């Protein structure tokens, strides 16, 4: 699209330390007055070589690193890191562990969407929700802290299960949170959704058609807001999501408002999933001890340290077979995947990360061309990126 300019174009550098930048992203924007002619994202300020680090760490040693990709939804990065070797070596996860994982993942999804909503609203001029979301998010972090010992960077998932069982009274506490949180989402909607100033800022801004969304390889709310009913929890049938009753949240418009509505709807569905999982959670082990037995071989005894209950223990280290496998989960921002190649060694031969933020960000220059300067923040905010996973 060729845009005729009235004056000499001006080049402005937004970021990498701009208050609305959501991390260290730099945008080189070419302006004609207030109109955006071109936009070039500059990435790599937070690149730490995560894929190379994985090649000389065992999966267990690598687990604390992965929580630094998308540091606002760390349960998902942990889930994908343990799912890959589980699928590669065909380790089954006990039912209870699978339910615990679902509960943790959905709580993490709500926390991530809350911390998207607050700054997104602040970017377009509404300060109030920014303070509200921290109140609810803090409660989720309290639940995480009592179950995993950490507010963020939980290091909770293990190959074949989870690190430690849910503490006494946690399920009741979590159900109380769900009962408290559902009316709060309705409160956000009353405050935001029909606000005329908010609608002026987001309706028709950053529109992505269904074909564009598919061709650009978008995923998550970016894809579902463009009329594509695609959710990996339904498509890939991982964990026990099929046993619970929930619906895919989607919209047809494809603009910033549609992406907002999808995420609000997802928070409601997540609460529904958590409530059902808490009520249906079975008893039994929270980890697969078969993985430990494989590690011990024939010398395994019933009263070894490996089988004693001692808070959070590391997973056993075992060799990854000479195979390759792609595993993905539906993270809050989209399809988070790992392509893992084993080499009969305890270290992965290659661990490729498919981060949703990186791929969703590619469409940004196309969306902002021809828009006003102020719309850049709306569009960038509606994409929802975390630079930790974009730069890896």
From Swiss-Prot:
Known catalytic reactions: a plastoquinone + NADH + (n+1) H(+)(in) = a plastoquinol + NAD(+) + n H(+)(out); a plastoquinone + NADPH + (n+1) H(+)(in) = a plastoquinol + NADP(+) + n H(+)(out)
GO cellular component: chloroplast thylakoid membrane
Enzyme class: translocase
The protein's Enzyme Commission number: 7.1.1.-
The keyword 4Fe-4S belongs to this UniProt entry's keyword annotation: no
Keywords tagged on the record: Chloroplast, Membrane, NAD, NADP, Plastid, Plastoquinone, Quinone, Thylakoid, Translocase, Transport
Membrane topology: Peripheral membrane protein
Location of this chain's protein in the cell: Plastid, Chloroplast thylakoid membrane
Molecular-function annotations in GO: NAD binding; oxidoreductase activity, acting on NAD(P)H, quinone or similar compound as acceptor; quinone binding
PROSITE patterns named in the record: COMPLEX1_49K (PS00535)
Record GO biological process: photosynthesis, light reaction
Summary of subunit composition and partner proteins: NDH is composed of at least 16 different subunits, 5 of which are encoded in the nucleus.
PANTHER family xref list: NADH DEHYDROGENASE [UBIQUINONE] IRON-SULFUR PROTEIN 2, MITOCHONDRIAL, NADH-UBIQUINONE OXIDOREDUCTASE 49 KDA SUBUNIT
NCBIfam families per record: NuoD, PRK06075.1, PRK07415.1
Family to which this protein belongs: Belongs to the complex I 49 kDa subunit family.
Function per UniProt: NDH shuttles electrons from NAD(P)H:plastoquinone, via FMN and iron-sulfur (Fe-S) centers, to quinones in the photosynthetic chain and possibly in a chloroplast respiratory chain. The immediate electron acceptor for the enzyme in this species is believed to be plastoquinone. Couples the redox reaction to proton translocation, and thus conserves the redox energy in a proton gradient.
Protein name: NAD(P)H-quinone oxidoreductase subunit H, chloroplastic
Gene: ndhH
């Amino acid at each position: 699209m060729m845009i005729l300019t009235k004056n000499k174009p001006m080049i402005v550098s937004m970021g990498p330390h701009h208050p609305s930048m959501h991390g260290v992203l730099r945008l080189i924007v070419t302006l004609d007055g207030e109109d955006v002619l071109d936009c070039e994202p500059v990435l790599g300020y937070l690149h730490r070589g995560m894929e190379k680090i994985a090649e000389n760490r065992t999966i267990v040693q690598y687990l604390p690193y992965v929580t630094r990709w998308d540091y606002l939804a760390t349960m998902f990065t942990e889930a994908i890191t343990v799912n890959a070797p589980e699928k590669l070596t065909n380790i089954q996860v006990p039912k209870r562990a699978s339910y615990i994982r679902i509960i943790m993942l959905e709580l993490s999804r709500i926390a991530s969407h809350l911390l998207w909503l607050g700054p997104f609203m602040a970017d377009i001029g509404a300060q109030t929700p920014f303070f509200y979301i921290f109140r609810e998010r803090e409660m989720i972090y309290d639940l995480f802290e009592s179950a995993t010992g950490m507010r963020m960077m939980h290091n909770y998932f293990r190959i074949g299960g989870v690190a430690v069982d849910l503490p006494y009274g946690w399920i009741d506490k979590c159900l109380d949170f769900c009962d408290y949180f559902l009316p709060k989402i309705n409160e956000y909607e009353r405050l935001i959704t029909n606000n005329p100033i908010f609608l002026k800022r987001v309706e028709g801004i950053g529109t992505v058609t269904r074909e564009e969304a598919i061709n650009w390889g978008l995923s998550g709310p970016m894809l579902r807001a463009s009329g594509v009913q695609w959710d990996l929890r339904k498509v890939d049938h991982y964990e026990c999501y099929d046993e619970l009753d929930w619906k895919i949240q989607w919209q047809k418009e494809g603009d910033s408002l549609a992406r907002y509505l999808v995420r609000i709807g997802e928070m409601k569905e997540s609460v529904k999933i958590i409530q059902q999982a808490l009520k249906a959670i079975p008893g039994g082990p929270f980890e697969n001890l078969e993985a430990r037995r494989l590690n011990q071989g024939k010398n395994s005894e019933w009263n070894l340290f490996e089988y004693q209950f001692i808070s959070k223990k590391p997973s056993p280290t075992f060799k990854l077979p000479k195979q390759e496998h792609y595993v993905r989960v539906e993270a809050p921002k989209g399809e988070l995947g790992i392509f893992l190649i084993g080499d009969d060694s305890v270290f992965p031969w290659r661990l490729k990360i498919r981060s949703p933020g990186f791929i969703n960000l590619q469409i940004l220059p196309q969306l902002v061309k021809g828009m006003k300067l102020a719309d850049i923040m709306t569009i960038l905010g509606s994409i929802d990126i975390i630079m930790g996973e974009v730069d890896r």
